[in-house]
Amino acid sequence: MEEMQILVPVAVKSKLTETLKTTLLNEIGQNISRVEHDMAQLEFEANGKLAEQAKINIQAVAPLRAQYEAQKARMQQVKDKLNADKEHLEKLAIGAELNRQPMNRIVTVHVGDDMNALTGGEMLDEDGKIIAFSN
């Protein structure tokens, strides 16, 4: 075997434009709304189930309440993270580079190739169009 094809990760960055900023802020806003809705739904369900459990076995209420509180705390952490992301994005200047989810590229390697030259790589896009590559 003299050659092999491998997947090499490529960093993807997006240049922040008004369009991208608006899109990302809208996505974050929708996610915050979804989490708030889920938290309200959890509160509603918890109140009903806790009241029902209190009628059956009052001693089982405390562990059940703790479960709901833990789940509510996890949801609050998600909401706090989303709000922090939103604040960070609002402060970013147009033209800033945002790290996005990396992609993979297929590279054919041969015996004796310099692995350092093959790894890495970066791609920059602006409004969905690739504008630059770098290694």
Indicate residue ranges for each PLM-predicted region.
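Short, charge-rich amphipathic alpha-helices with coiled-coil/heptad character
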Residues: M1-L25
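Amphipathic alpha-helical coiled-coil segments
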Residues: K21, L25-V35, M39-L42, Y68, ...
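Extended alpha-helical coiled-coil "stalk/arm" regions
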Residues: R34-V61
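An N-terminal amphipathic alpha-helical segment
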Residues: A51-A54, A62-D80
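Coiled-coil termination/hinge junctions
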Residues: K72-E122
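Short, acidic, Ser/Thr-enriched surface-loop or helix-capping motifs
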Residues: D125
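Short linear motifs in exposed loops
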Residues: F133-N135
